[in-house]
Structures are given as structure tokens and as C-alpha cells.
Amino acid sequence: MDKRKFPWQLLPKQTTKSTDHGADQKSTFRAPAHDQVGFLARAAAKWAVILLALRQILTIGTTMVVSRYVSPEEFGIAGMVLSFVAFLVLFDTGLTWVTVQSPNLEREKVNALFAFGVLLGVLLWLAAFIAGPLLATFYGQPELEVVSLIMGAAVFLNSLTTQPAALLKRQLKQKTTNIVDTVALLISSIVAVAMAVAHTGYWAVIGQAVALQAVRSVLLFIYSGYRPTWPTRIGSAVPELKMGMGLALSNYICYFQLYLGGILVGRYFGGAILGNYQKAYGVKSMPTAYATMVVTDVMVSSLSALSTDRDRMGAAYLKALRLIAFVGCPAGAMLYAIAPEVIRILYGAQWGGAVPLLEWYSVAAVALPISTTTIWLFLASGQVRLQLKMNIFLSTLAVVVLIGALQIFGTAESVVAAESLLFAGPYLVINVVLSHRAVGLRVMPTIKTLVPIIVGCLACTASAVLVGSVYAYLIWWVLLLAKISVGGVVYLSFAMAFIRPMPLVSKLGGNGRGA
């Protein structure tokens, strides 16, 4: 990236669009040809690496500042609404990926999907308004009435971006997408820090969420090249809407796997413990975010484009899986050994209650990079019904196990422990098996790819824990460096001896040979 330019200066210049509406309605948004997928994926991954690094610096820096001005109790109040908002926006995810996957996509269909998305956004904002008093009663926090109404604006703005974002992903224009996301994060981070320093409490968290969606929606419309018009045949998108609703329904059911723990903690233990829970949950997700954000959008689009060529799809998936597991799994495992130091650096001394929760979450953090890749396969296959059945079973299991753990042990830590064991056990195994079945891939090559990586994770974590116990008298930051250094050396030594082939980013979007 040109160091003399800001991210928004790197966005592609827009060309003048035709005003011939008749021709415009007949135009299509074509997915890349098979022989272009590798080149576009590699180019997108290179840009994503640079901009992902920048976004993570912004995210961590913002978190470090805001967490020192906003208390765990106030973060917990914001989190009570954010969990509900996450539930509302799940339908938008279905509308996004159905556009990415559609083999033939005319502008009229996109317009129909956009119109439906706008209507949905209005209804979701209304739902946020109605839910405010209910959330306030459920959690015992009167502030949630107003907070829910304001956060509804972010939900509405997000619904406007589903089609512009989907069209960019469909065409593998990840450079533009990543720059848009980076600029939106930069501006929203400035808003959050300014509000936190001004001692606005939980409004700093809410303000960042709304500002992020506002900036992102404007930029996506500008740089996607999509200009919506009212559809003349709204029924033209009925097949896509049905598929999108199927994906959304699956997401809604899956929601309980991801957020039930937080809902229970907030309901029974209050805002302060929920704040610690959310911080630990966020750190648990970081290794997966670092490892997968670079390629997730690229891989869904690429695998969808290669869906008729099973051999190339399998080779591309294994290469991406190997890379993501190689980076994300050991990083997740090491969270067990370095939890006290990580929480201290990121959030400050007031967040010590998050440490034991993060230690438990390290178990889930090892599995998450792997299970995240299975989502690509489900999306690429288009087998919504299979994914829906799986999520119904797993969500039912989550409800039974988490409520059971709460009733038996009665602590927030027991809820986190149950969550982690579910993530690393039933969730992972069932997702891997069924996602491979959905696209017709064999499971055994995936298992062979993962076994040496998992063993290496255990070795590096054990060595780091040993260092921590032997040299516990050291200054905390020196001890952190010692743990990371020893754990890293052990893992890389193990990898060089047993992991073949070694993951290479430059091979990610290759032609499928030598997976």
C-alpha cells in the first residue's frame, strides 16, 4: 500500500454510468470465470493481509483506550443490546450470500432483493424499538429502552448495504471491500475514543456501532457501482428470497449456539460479569478473526465458482484450511498460558475477572479456526436444508447443556466451560462431517491435515505453561515474552518436522495442484 496515501485515496475511481435504463435492467452481474478465480483470489488476499493488519491495529488500539474509560458494568449494558442486535441482523447475512452464490444474477433481481432488504431494515428497527422495554425488564436495566432504539439505526443501515456488499464479493473485488471496511472502522474508532474520553460511558460503544454502519453504507454505495431502482417485477427474486430466508433461519437457530451463554450470564449475574464475559469472548475470537478474515470472503466466492469442479474445490479448501489452522489454532491454544497478560494489555487492571473465563475459552479458540472454514463449504454448496437441520440439533444441544451447567454449578465460569467444550467437541465434529458431505469432499484428508497442527498446539501451550510456572517471579511483560518465545519455538520446530506441506499464502488461490 502506498504510504503516501490514506485508505480512501486507494479506492478505484468511478466511471460514468449509462443512463439507458432499459439496457440497465437487462444487465447482469457476472461471477468470475473459473480460470480467473485463482488470480483474483491471490490478488484479493494480498490486499486483505495489509488492510486486515491495519484494521486490527485500529481495533486493538481503540479497545485499549475505550476499556480504560468505560467500566465492565457499562460495557455489559451495551452488550445486552448488542447481543439482541446481532440476532436482528442475521437475516441480512442470508440476503448477502444468496447474491454471491446465484449463477445468473440480473439487475432486476438485485433491485428486488434490495427493496426487500430496505423493508426488512425498517421492520427490524421497529422490532428494536418494541424490544427496548422487554430487554429493560429482562435484564433489570431501564437504560436499555433508549439504547435499543438507537442501536436499531445500525440495524437499518446494515440492511441497506447487503446488495452493494454482495456484488463486490461476488466479483471478488476484495480490495475495494477491505478499504471501505477499513475507512469505516477508522472513523467509527475516532468516534468511540472521543466519546469514551468524554466519559459518556456505554454510549461510546453504541456510538461506534452506529457510526461504523453509517460510514460503511455510504462508501459501499459509492464504490460498488450499484444504483438501486424500484423493481418492476419484485417476484423475480422469489427463488433467491426463499434461499436467503433459509440461510437466515439457519443463522437464527445458530444464534443460540453463539449468544445463549452471554444472555444467561447477563440475566443471572449482571452487567459487570457480562462485561468480563464479553471481553473474554472477544479475545477468544481474535485468533480466528486474524486467520480467516483475510480469506473468508474470497474463499466463499472462489468455492462457489469452483462448485462444478470437485477436485479443484477440494484442493483449494485444503490449502486454505491448512493455512488458517496453522496460524489460528496455536494462537488460540496459547491464550490459556498468556490469559493474564493479554487481558492486562488489552483492557487494563479493572478487567481481571475476564482471565479465568479466557482460560476456558482457549479450548474453543483452538477449534474455531477449523469450524469457521466449514461455513465456506455450506455456503458454496447451497444446501440450506442440511445446514438448517444441523443447527437445529446443535442449538437444542446448546440450550440443554448451558442451562444444565448453570443449574448445576451456578457460576458464570461453568457456563463458559460448557460453551468451550461444546465448541471443541460436538460443534466441530458435526460441522466438519456434514459440510464435507454437502460438497462431496472426503473427511479423511482434512483430518490428516489437522492432526499434526493440533498436536503442535498442545506442545506449545504446555511449554508456555511450564515457563509461566517456573519463572512466575519475573515482571509480567518479561514473563509474557518468555511464554510466547518458548511456545513459538516449540510449535515452529514441531511444524518443520511434521507438517507437510508448510502453508504458504502465495499458494492460497492456486490452481489446485499439490493440495
Q: Which sequence ranges carry the predicted segments?
A:
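Signature of the first transmembrane helix
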Residues: 2-27, 36-94, 116, 120-134, ...
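Membrane-proximal transmembrane or re-entrant/amphipathic helices at the cytosolic face
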Residues: 1-35, 432, 436-446, 450, ...
